[in-house]
Curated annotation (Swiss-Prot):
Extracellular compartment segments: 1-57, 109-182, 227-255, 315-342, 418-426, 487-491
Entry's transmembrane regions: 58-78, 88-108, 183-203, 206-226, 256-276, 294-314, 343-363, 399-417, 427-445, 466-486, 492-512
Region of interest (Disordered), residue spans: 1-25
Protein name stated in the entry: Choline transporter
Remarks, miscellaneous: Inhibition of activity by intracellular choline.
Subcellular localization(s) per the UniProt record: Membrane
Length: 563
């Protein structure tokens, strides 16, 4: 890991070798007199030009709460198990988690390096702007932002749909005569979406909700895992069932294809690792905090999801009953078998439900920031409307509501196909990976020769970039395969149509409108300093810029993470 001093925009300050002790004291006094944005009376911070900015109200733990609250791997495994357990059984999910976690380390490393070099709420589309050749930088940034925003909307839709499936499944478990239909889940989806969208309408509560989501998720994980193991009374499956038994119920004659298609379950559970990068304007020292949050999300996700599935699969009493269940939520059937009572299974299901609320709220936080940041550069129709931060609530409210409107419409896909959930999951994974590879390709084209930030892993970073590119191609191709055979109009995976259609729309919008309106100009040094250093006026940032190099010089040899 390379450790160097970095400025707010990801480059390096050249220290003034002629600085003396009195200069240091004067500069430190200037720094101490700066008024943080958190102390301002307004809900959002008001710059010298009158524009309302986001407040720096997030800490490392609340950023990690947003990151893990969204990725939430053990929860993702639970709610999307229906998309994976029939493609290989427990064995596929266990080994799938290991495979995807290793790949996620590489994805997290790639994103962490870029977020450390260029901390910005735009995330990958901002990195594309900084790294792409001048001739193509605007188009690269636009396509990257367009893919990223689409991925965030599909993530929110798929997460909300998984929660709706869980709720309907809980009712079906206690009412054996009830047969869930698609319209039941659709109605539940829309009601849950309407309820949960209000939590992102007021910014002051978001850090509290984010931190709480982390603790609620971990508490639910421990409670469910311990309860299931304890109530199994030692009646566990043998290791061969968990680690070496392959069950293919997909109709694919090739077991390898079935396994690969089933990887969508753990892949979805480790997606959205860029979430924390879009909070860069709302946290101190984002060049350090964001990479920690990303890698922490992967680490916590692997430990919780792996331990969770091991406990669940050793406790299954009848796999065939789980696969043939009509609840639509296999994890509830596993709880019911382990506890031997539906009331206990419903209680554990409620813990998943509480965890899911934090996950969906984190989804909304993330997608709103992406939409807002992209709209600031005129990347969307009516960008002026979506790029505003509401001065009363302190959040990009218009961007949030517009994104929620799209989720409402995407929910209609579930009425068209019985495998729409699989399509939404694939859309989430594919669009996000496509947005990641654009800046990574630009980084590799520069031979990784950039003014990097404090998080930089050298050769392993290069290896991670290559893995990310290969995984993207693999995922977009294989996760677009039909989940079951024979294929009909009702079970077809329509995500390939969605990806091609949306890409065509983005290119056409760029050609006829975006090319003229999408400015994507780099922010001035003053504006970036205002965000990164938590100043309330541009004048303060100018004063601090004189002091910064000397103050940073004192810490030149302090290891990363200890400054």
């Amino acid at each position: 890991m390379s450790i160097r001093n970095d400025n707010a925009s990801g480059g390096y300050m050249q220290p003034d070798q002629s600085s003396n002790a009195s200069m240091h004291k004067r500069d430190l006094r200037v720094e101490e007199e700066i008024k943080p944005l958190d102390d301002m009376d307004s809900k959002g911070a008001v710059a010298a030009d009158g524009e309302v900015h986001l407040r720096k109200s997030f800490s490392l733990w609340s950023i990690l709460g947003v990151g893990f609250g969204l990725t939430n791997s053990w929860f993702g495994i639970s709610t999307s198990m229906v998309a994976g357990i029939s493609s290989g059984g427990p064995m596929m999910i266990v080994y799938g988690i290991i495979i995807v976690a290793l790949i996620s380390i590489c994805i997290g490393t790639s994103l962490g390096e870029l977020s450390s070099a260029y901390p910005h709420a735009g995330g990958q589309f901002w990195w594309s702007l900084k790294l792409a050749p001048p001739k193509y930088k605007r188009f690269a940034a636009y396509m990257c932002g367009s893919f990223a925003y689409a991925g965030s909307v599909f993530t929110s839709a798929s997460t909300t749909l998984s929660v709706a499936t869980e709720v309907v499944g809980m009712y079906a478990l206690t009412h054996p005569e009830f047969i869930p239909k698609r319209w039941h889940i659709f109605v539940c989806f829309e009601l849950l979406h309407l309820f949960l969208m209000f939590f992102n309408c007021y910014g002051k509560s978001l850090p509290i909700i984010s931190s709480s989501s982390l603790y609620i998720s971990l508490l639910s994980f421990f409670t469910i895992t311990i309860t299931v193991l304890a109530c199994s009374h030692g009646k566990f499956n043998d290791a061969k069932f968990v680690f070496a038994t392959f069950n293919n119920e997909t109709g694919w004659k090739n077991g390898g294809i079935a396994f690969i298609v089933g990887l969508i379950n753990p892949a979805w559970s480790f997606s959205c690792l860029d979430c924390a990068t879009h909070m860069a304007f709302e946290v101190e020292k984002p060049e350090r905090v964001i990479p920690i949050a990303i890698m922490g999300t992967v680490a916590i996700g692997f430990v919780t999801s792996f331990c969770y599935v091991i406990a669940m699969f050793f406790s299954i009493q009848d796999l065939d009953a789980v696969l043939s269940s009509t609840t639509g939520a296999p994890i509830l059937d596993i709880y019911n078998q382990a506890l031997g009572n539906k009331s206990g299974a419903i209680f554990l299901g409620c813990l998943i439900l509480f965890t899911s609320f934090g996950c969906v709220i984190a989804c909304h936080t993330w997608q709103a920031r992406l939409c807002w940041s992209f709209a600031r550069d005129n990347g969307l129709p009516l960008s002026r409307l979506w790029s505003q931060v509401n001065p009363h609530t302190g959040v990009p409210l218009n961007a949030h509501l517009m994104s929620c409107a799209w989720i409402t419409l995407i929910g209609l896909l579930y009425l068209a196909s019985s495998t729409a959930f699989q399509s939404l999951i694939t859309g989430c994974i594919a669009f996000l990976l496509l947005s990641y590879i654009i800046p990574v390709i630009c980084l590799l084209a520069k031979k990784r020769n950039i003014a990097h930030g404090p998080f930089w892993l050298g050769k392993f970073g290069f290896f991670s970039n290559i893995v990310l590119l290969g995984w993207t191609v693999f995922s977009v191709v294989f996760f677009s395969f039909p989940p079951v055979l024979p294929v009909t109009k009702d079970n077809m995976n329509y995500v390939c149509v969605v990806i091609v259609g949306y890409t065509a729309y983005s290119i056409l919008y760029w050609k006829y409108k975006g090319k003229k309106e999408f400015h994507a100009l780099e922010e001035s040094e003053n504006e970036q300093a205002e965000y990164s250093n938590n100043f309330d006026t541009i004048e303060d940032s100018r004063e601090f810029s004189v002091a910064a190099s000397d103050v940073e010089l004192e810490n030149e040899h302090v290891p990363w993470g200890k400054k």
